[in-house]
Curated annotation (Swiss-Prot):
Residues 21-31 have a biased composition (Gly residues). Part of the 50S ribosomal subunit. This is Large ribosomal subunit protein uL15. Gene3D superfamilies: 3.100.10.10. GO terms for molecular function: rRNA binding; structural constituent of ribosome. The gene is rplO. Belongs to the universal ribosomal protein uL15 family. Residues 1-52 are annotated as: Disordered.
Length: 144
């Protein structure tokens, strides 16, 4: 068996109905669109969320909240991901070099998820309480 020889089981796929191809097909003339009306026309139909002229739900409800711009440039890094970084001193630039965080990130917070198996020094990164305890238990330290 090879990927280029795979095919669906016999009878599993049905050919699509060819509409508008004569009255004998059962889907000729109006092709299942009915008579007249907006939906029978070429390009007919209404946009998503349109409620027939009634004020739509997305406009009846008030706006709320916002997207924090700082959250967009802040990354969370798991303890287990620190193993992907070479060297003992880990800072923002070494995380970017190891492709652990994206190049557009300006802040990093290390969270307790997984385990750290070597002594590392974190420099200039924010760390949660649980992650701090795990790093210090492994013999590492955190420098602000």
């Amino acid at each position: 068996m090879r990927l280029n020889t795979l095919s669906p089981a016999e009878g599993a796929k049905h050919a699509p109905k060819r509409v508008g191809r004569g009255i004998g097909s059962g889907l000729g003339k109006t092709a299942g669109r009915g008579h007249k009306g907006q939906n029978s026309r070429s390009g007919g139909g209404v946009r998503r969320g349109f409620e027939g002229g009634q004020m739509p739900l997305y406009r009846r409800l008030p706006k709320f909240g916002f997207t924090s711009r700082k959250a967009m440039i802040t990354a969370e890094v798991r303890l287990s991901e620190l193993a992907l970084v070479e060297g003992d001193v880990i800072d923002l630039n070494t995380l970017k070099a190891a492709n652990v965080v994206g190049i557009q990130m300006e802040f990093v917070k290390v969270i307790l998820s997984g385990e750290v198996n070597r002594a590392v020094t974190l420099r200039g990164l924010r760390v949660t309480k649980g992650a701090r305890a795990a790093i210090e238990a492994a013999g590492g330290k955190i420098e602000e």
